[in-house]
Amino acid sequence: MADSDDEYDRKRRDKFRGERSDSYRTERRDDRRPLGGSGSARDEWSDRNPFRGGASAGGGGGGARHRPDYSDYRGPGPRARYGSPGRDLPPAKRMRPDWGDGDVRPNPRFGGYDPYLMQAWNDHYQSIHSAYSHGSHMPPVRESGGSGGDSLTQPAMLNLKQFLDTQDENISDSEVMRKYTEYKTDFKRQQLNEFFVAHKDEEWFKNKYHPEDSVRRAEEQRGFLKRRTDVFVELLENGTIGSVKVDSVQGDALIRVLDTCVIKLEGGTDEDLKALDEKPKETPVYERKHDPAPVKAVDEVKSPKKETEKEASPVIVSPQRKSVKPLNSDDENWDEEVAAPPKKDVEEEPKALESGSEDKSRRKKSAKRKRVNSGDDSSSESDSSSSSDDEDEEKLKKKYDVEDGLRSEQKAEAEKDKEMQDAKVIEAPESPKEATENSAEEVKASDAAETPAEEAEQEKPEVAEEVNRPKQDQENGDKITTEDGETKSDSEENKVMETETIDLDKVRDGQPRALHRTSSIFLRNLAPSITKAEIEAVCTRFSGYLRVAIADPLVERRWYRRGWITFTRDVNIKEICWSLNNQRLRDCEMGAIVNRDLSRRVRPANGITAHKQVVRSDIKLCAKIILNLDERFRLWPEPTSDDSIPFDRAGESSANGNTSTYGIKSKNPVLQNITDYLIEEASAEEEELLGLTGENKDAEGEPIERDEHLLAVLDRLVLYLRIVHSVDYYNHCEYPYEDEMPNRCGIIHARGPAPSRVTSNDIHEYVKTYESKLQQFLTKTALLSDEETKDLGAKDAETEVEKFVQANTQELAKDKWLCPLSGKKFKGPEFIRKHIFNKHEEKVDEVRKEVQYFNNYLRDPKRPQLPEHPGSSKRPESESGRGGGSGYRPPMYPPFSGMPYGFSPSMMGGGRGGRNFPPVRRELPLEHQRRLIGYHDLDAPANSDMFD
């Protein structure tokens, strides 16, 4: 009761309490608080005030706060014990847990994939800066599971000290080291086996190591390379390759060469290459036409003769189709236009129809005015609704009256034509003589009663007749001369009618096709379980689909992949992208977006590459890379061992006088006589006699020296690498799976503008650095030996088959055994063994393939696997010793540079000292610490526990 009275009195004395904020009143009340004992009622006021946390937080809460204490909202948890919370900043923003963990429901949008790597930062932050655990605690170790719960690293391996804690105290040092080595080997084997089991059913993993799928994929890639090689040789022979230089100033010429290769790879002809000379058309802009009343249109073939009369004759376009038509497109949609009937018949009919339609429109307008006036006078809802319905009907009739009349006449004419053609086929004579007589009579009869539709049939497209004429001349020897002077036959007329649509396709194929220009869609998220066939099944429903490419998965993306879907240029790519975004594959959104065209296809490299000395070095490197890649994919038949000499022995053979084996023997045309350009020449004697040393050149530098002959040789090698092997030499990289990407031969790096002068030191440094960057192409991939794979846990096929037989042999009772594969019972295990090898041979073959599958994975020195846990690597003594306070401290910063909201530098106290913790005192080195001095009585007895 006393508390209530005191509170009431204090509120009554507060004169301006309605004009002040809660925080201001709180501070004033805090100032008026007497310094009494803890039993005072006013000392407990802060506990009841939700905006006061000084006393409850612990640690001398006398300071005023200008914001609420967020620690009061934590609920019943451990409170901070140190420091003054008066000036504390709010805690860092709580990160969401990982989507793949079991305690939280995964996000259905990404199917368990963490695209922003928030879990890595969350684990790191919670282990160091959490208010609920001290900084000296070890970070939580996340175990690796299957593909769904796969972590970003392997679990932490025990160090030697931790391993010793699990062993007996009386164990010897040699025994400890032996057991620890076995532990590390078993740990590595276990991780490889777990990774294999987690990913063996995924398509990308099968394409790499499965004994059947990997061979099929390798043959497919080799077929792509063979096709590229044929195209390059063709362009090399016709002079296209030799007419261009790999310089950035010749960007247009380089792009033309690359586009020529793409058109050839797509199956284009020399006629299609003319599309490169045409100005690229603007990207069509699509608009959706909204028209009511679905009405079917009758399409007729437009005659090329009538193109000049197209504007004069009325064109009937169906208003019902909600089709998507591109704007600013002339001939791309020429076959979608509806042709008009011949001018002779249409000239008279529209006049009569127009006059009738004008009379109708006048009557309708007058009736409309009357209805408007009557609608103003009357106020009934029925009259207004009926008038609105009449207006809608009149609008529709007004719009479609003329078209309906013409459409009905066209249908009648089409039926007449069909009946006449059927009559001609039925009355076809047996002998050629009778055929000529009967057909002549039919022509005369048809001239007497000729309809407008028959005139349109007589005026067939000229191009279609020219295409079919040679074939028809060979098949039909007898011709008929009509009154108009044209030669025709019955079979010719029938063939023209039957192959009318095919002829239109031939007409369109005669135009150059821009096969190098495509439209594409980028898929951001593809689960590892999604196969290429599933994506193709979704995309084949859209017209213009060409191919799909799927990238290899990345460990930092939780083995999610990216994809590119390629379509022809004339499709509405945005509509397809919208449709793909509304679909899900295996409960995973693909994240489809439109892929833009390449902005800069020719990009400049360092201009020092044009120097003669650098060019000679580049020729040597290019030749080595070409030899290595050609041998890897077996593009050219290998020459005999006597004919091929490596680079290092080429000089020795020439010095011994063996000129027959001089150089490198290869059937690759770009490597013919390549060794002649690898031998460096210099005027050493002349420079020595004239006293021209290289000291001045090193100090001042020398101008860039270009050798056009060497550059021409290098350009052939660079273009061969780019076109055939998809290796961009001046960017020291390879563009993988380029044959399935939207842009084949898309980007190339060329020599940029050369500097004025260059020193020899710069040249040597550049050559050395560039060779190190190209080591991935220079070194041959060697598989691991059997002994090395055995150490990694390689399996034996017969041993695994025996394990399979034992696992499927179950003893039910005495002399009663069961085979789980078939459910049959046998008297002994030997009968089950015989039964498995006879009746379940495919299961045994699967076991053998599984063993080969696993061993292929182990033999790859660049096999994919989870990276080692940071705690498994050796750490410096400063972190693991006395100064760290913990066995392992993860890196201070997250993988990205930005820190979460609310993060302050005061919270970065050496990986410890988070919220409400005092800053950790750094210990000084031993020589800077104050030496403790002990005082003792000389008369006292000796004490071993005194200071020095």
Swiss-Prot record:
Family the entry assigns: Belongs to the ARS2 family.
Any one biological process term the GO annotation gives: defense response to Gram-negative bacterium
Subcellular location: Nucleus
Role summary: Acts as a mediator between the cap-binding complex (CBC) and RNA-mediated gene silencing (RNAi). Involved in innate immunity via the short interfering RNAs (siRNAs) processing machinery by restricting the viral RNA production. Also involved microRNA (miRNA)-mediated silencing by contributing to the stability and delivery of primary miRNA transcripts to the primary miRNA processing complex containing drosha and pasha.
This protein's name: Serrate RNA effector molecule homolog
Biased segments, Acidic residues type: 329-338
Residue numbers spanned by region Disordered: 1-106, 274-497, 856-893
Positions with biased composition (Basic residues): 362-372
